[in-house]
Amino acid sequence: MLRTHLSGELRKENAGQSVTLTGWVARRRDHGGVIFIDLRDRSGIAQVVFRNEDVAERAHALRSEFVLQVTGVVEKRPEGSENPNLASGDVEVSVTDFTVLNESAPLPFQIEDASSAGEVGEETRLKYRYLDLRRPVQANALRLRSAANKAARTVLDSHDFTEIETPTLTRSTPEGARDFLVPARLKPGTFYALPQSPQLFKQLLQVAGMERYYQIARCYRDEDFRADRQPEFTQLDVEMSFVDQEDVIALAEEILTEVWKLIGYEISTPIPRITYADAMRLYGSDKPDLRFDIQITECTDFFADTTFRVFKNEYVGAVVMKGGASQPRRQLDAWQEWAKQRGAKGLAYILVGEDGELGGPVAKNITDAEREGIAAHVGAEPGDCIFFAAGDTRSSRALLGAARDEIARKLDLIRDGEWSFVWVVDAPMFESAADATASGDVALGNSKWTAVHHAFTSPKPEFLDTFDENPGEALAYAYDIVCNGNEIGGGSIRIHQRDVQERVFKVMGISEEEARDKFGFLLDAFAFGAPPHGGIAFGWDRIVSLLGGFDSIRDVIAFPKSGGGVDPLTDAPAPITPLQRKESGIDAKPKAAENKPEEK
């Protein structure tokens, strides 16, 4: 080894010892011919001092991020010069000799200057990600991720799970997003697909009798740009045989409990549950943030006989902003712009004066009886503001759910370090294909119905015989775990019977021929004694970003893509050469296709 000790591990007990350290020059300070350098390695920082005239003279040439090997004697710092912010702050190393292992070019941004961290653009940080990761905060994010991996593995290993790798080159199967395709050179005109999840393989492993599988899996989805999404991401993927929903939830809670212990937080279990229907009714979201107590009040029946045209709609709902009546007009106008940015025409409101009198444009257009009763109906008090949404139920609730979150931010209702977990259960099995497409998802099949979770989710037992007769009424045997308004995991009990799977495909408009072509291997496997099974997948990037207090999952990924799916470091994606294109067979037709007559 090129060193005897790590910089961040030196203590008073090491005083008098001769040590050799290696690392990077984090800071350099000259004081009357004596040079002080903060030497950084993976463990932290040690102050090394160049007092000897010969070494001090040579040290004048050292610059930020030079790589050094220094040898010297550990000494206690003079009284009053200790640094309580450093683990090694009681000591320093008096250098007797050093070697420059490598020099550094001028830096594109300062690594150690915490005050300028927010001034460096993300594109620059990602382009020089290897420098960005020298910052302790960024490096510690990856270490936290490693610790989370270890904690999860420890839990799963204790329950006799087997870690199994599944293919990353597979066939294209419809799973809810577009596939990344890889040309197969040895079979021109055909393509592999990178997996959107290990879903089908982990189910096949249950058919194989493995019973308890897990994997920290890389997944790939060619989605349109969405904030804080990555085209490649990581799941902690878990599947179990001979289980029901309660078994999977209990295991998931054990994993989450151990992972959150890494930051000193004890999750209270069992984690509360809410039905999907109640989540949408009360919070306007299937991933509600329950750190604050603001609920949506339904007002459709209250305004059933209204003369106000805006409220003559399928749905009317409201949320209350405590103290919101004191907002200036410009802030109320800003709320309208906020709503329009979300596709709404605006956000109607009533101001409840300190004397109880109602103000605002809505108050002038509703009946006397409605004016007298609306504050009590929604739970508003003098000084509050009532925001309304009216229209179709789905979009109106979504707008009120977003308003609820915005109110919490404006009123500073969310405390640092506060955690709220909830299971969302009993989601619909199917949704309108038009709604799925409108929300940015890919609707599978050629029916007006598509799966809410995926096509392999079992209906709840009470809907097993009727889900294809009344798809809109069927509930899925599924469960999502939500933390602070973020969906951090989702799972379900799977279909394990071939006839049930074929019925689901039929509801979704997937023909027998397409089902055989895309999923024949799964249907065949179900014919050979597939056990009942279920599982869950955790969004590992999101979980680690929450643990570390990061705003973006990019901070917890070693080499992330930018928001547009571009890697500024390698400049990927990039064009390929004509020779690569020819050899890959991208433009070739599959032999089977060449033998078929062209469609007219």
Swiss-Prot record:
Its main location: cytoplasm. GO terms for molecular function: aspartate-tRNA ligase activity; aspartate-tRNA(Asn) ligase activity; ATP binding; nucleic acid binding. It is found in: Cytoplasm. L-aspartate binds at residues 175, 221, 453, 494. Pfam families: GAD, tRNA-synt_2, tRNA_anti-codon. Residues 580-600 have a biased composition (Basic and acidic residues). One of its GO terms (biological process) is aspartyl-tRNA aminoacylation. CDD domains: AspRS_core, EcAspRS_like_N. The record marks 31, 80 as: Important for tRNA non-discrimination. The keyword Ribosomal protein does not apply. It is an enzyme of class 6 (ligase). Its EC number is 6.1.1.23. ATP binds at residues 221-223, 230, 487, 539-542. InterPro entries: Aa-tRNA-synt_II, aa-tRNA-synth_II, aa-tRNA-synth_II/BPL/LPL, Asp-tRNA-ligase_1, Asp-tRNA-ligase_1_N, Asp/Asn-tRNA-synth_IIb, AspRS_core, GAD-like_sf. It catalyses: tRNA(Asx) + L-aspartate + ATP = L-aspartyl-tRNA(Asx) + AMP + diphosphate. Residues 199-202 are annotated as: Aspartate. GO terms for cellular component: cytoplasm. Keywords: Aminoacyl-tRNA synthetase, ATP-binding, Cytoplasm, Ligase, Nucleotide-binding, Protein biosynthesis. Homodimer. PANTHER family: ASPARTATE--TRNA LIGASE, MITOCHONDRIAL, ASPARTYL/LYSYL-TRNA SYNTHETASE. Belongs to the class-II aminoacyl-tRNA synthetase family. Type 1 subfamily. Aspartyl-tRNA synthetase with relaxed tRNA specificity since it is able to aspartylate not only its cognate tRNA(Asp) but also tRNA(Asn). Reaction proceeds in two steps: L-aspartate is first activated by ATP to form Asp-AMP and then transferred to the acceptor end of tRNA(Asp/Asn). This is Aspartate--tRNA(Asp/Asn) ligase. The lineage of its organism: Bacteria, Bacillati, Actinomycetota, Actinomycetes, Mycobacteriales.
